[in-house]
Amino acid sequence: MKRVLTALAAALPFAAHAADAISGAVERQPTNWQAIIMFLIFVVFTLGITYWASKRVRSRSDYYTAGGNITGFQNGLAIAGDYMSAASFLGISALVFTSGYDGLIYSLGFLVGWPIILFLIAERLRNLGRYTFADVASYRLKQGPIRILSACGSLVVVALYLIAQMVGAGKLIELLFGLNYHIAVVLVGVLMMMYVLFGGMLATTWVQIIKAVLLLFGASFMAFMVMKHVGFSFNNLFTEAMAVHPKGTAIMSPGGLVQDPISALSLGLGLMFGTAGLPHILMRFFTVSDAREARKSVFYATGFMGYFYILTFIIGFGAIMLVGANPAYKDAAGALIGGNNMAAVHLANAVGGNLFLGFISAVAFATILAVVAGLTLAGASAVSHDLYANVFRKGATEREELKVSKITVLVLGVIAIILGVLFENQNIAFMVGLAFAIAASCNFPIILLSMYWSKLTTRGAMLGGWLGLLTAVVLMILGPTIWVQILGHEKAIFPYEYPALFSISVAFLGIWFFSATDNSAEGNREREQFRAQFIRSQTGFGVEQGRAH
């Protein structure tokens, strides 16, 4: 377990979705016309889907959840498409390329949050909620305070993710396509807004499904060609890789990346519980018809992602053989052109030529679009459904709520483009780590305890949730990444890079303490309502109509 956690800790920079796929300065490449043509085909096709979806979006349910008509298999593919990022593909294969076996430990460790979602969250979440996870958290608690907290937690996570995605998208596209950074950021922002604005969840779902299929096909082809090169023998694969890698046989030894078990444990908890608190992932469970389909969604998604991460392991070792030992992919200093994160892209060229390189480059761009579309819809629903329709203007009509949601999409898109430009040369690696920490420290404890702990009260959820959120933010600021590397101080006040271990503990302890000491009449009433909520969560009685929060 210690080896797993230490590998996880070292690998977080590779997990920063598209943001960390390319970090620091990049060398702009010649214009890749094959990639641009393939990407244009993808854009035209998905815009056609958006037009088709726009004709079917007639209600709030259609816009937020595609009318609940997505099947478990389709939703599983869409979840995989939402979760498998550009850096999952480029970053993990790069980790295998540089560190060998530790990359496999990390890629499998990336899945540890999904059993929690499958066994503890998916079924009850679908039975209790309608559009956002705040529907579940506020089921028996006070609507206003809980929805404000849930919306704030969602928006902070979405904002951090969006900034990271936009910066990563600009740098990645500049490297792969030869396009100007600013043009790339604007292009991603405009396409993102079009998908969500006109097609809602239905268009977003199909963009994610198409992206997942393309990514799985591309990775499968690369892995197949690598295995064909070694006669479909893993022994030959590892032997040839060890023969050409600078570390030799050491690449087959796990646990050599970091020596700090506290940071490793903190990161492991952040990734595990943070996955179960990501608003754009949780929102996908409301797109299916019932709890059975929700469980099937997680089952299929976990299968697709597990298969994908195994492929990245083969791709990483293939890159060691076919890219690392080939001087054509090195610069004058002997380093990989574009950095180690480009190992998979160079391998695409090695096994499939320029045409397949163009395909993989286009898939990387499509990957970013699928993720930012899901994030934008989650952020818009938090504003329009949780804040506008249930806090600031109760009783708002569906038309008014949808209008606010679409305005929010435009605002989020413009803000994402502006911040993507402003953060071009900034270190944004910490943002995804902070997003996971906040999701794990604020969203996850409230969701879990609202469904499973009968003694939870509004006071406990509010105080504990805000404490968890603020603790994660403050400790991240005081830690080595921001306090030393960005702000330039000599020594960090908080010695660990990842705050999740401490902020999650603060959140759970705060929720428990302030709920246990809540003797108010309102608190007692909320405890008494747990039984009715429990029955609903187990049986799904009334789920077809949903609760009108």
Curated annotation (Swiss-Prot):
InterPro entries: Cation/Ac_symporter_ActP, Na/Glc_symporter_sf, Na/solute_symporter, Na/solute_symporter_CS, Sodium:Solute_Symporter. The gene is actP. One of its GO terms (cellular component) is plasma membrane. It comes from the Bacteria. This is Cation/acetate symporter ActP. The keyword Glycosyltransferase does not apply. Coiled coil: none annotated. Transports acetate. The keyword Transmembrane helix applies. PANTHER family: CATION_ACETATE SYMPORTER ACTP, SODIUM/PROLINE SYMPORTER-RELATED. The chain crosses the membrane at residues 33-53, 77-97, 103-123, 148-168, 183-203, 206-226, 262-282, 303-323, 355-375, 404-424, 428-448, 464-484, 493-513. Belongs to the sodium:solute symporter (SSF) (TC 2.A.21) family. It is a multi-pass membrane protein.
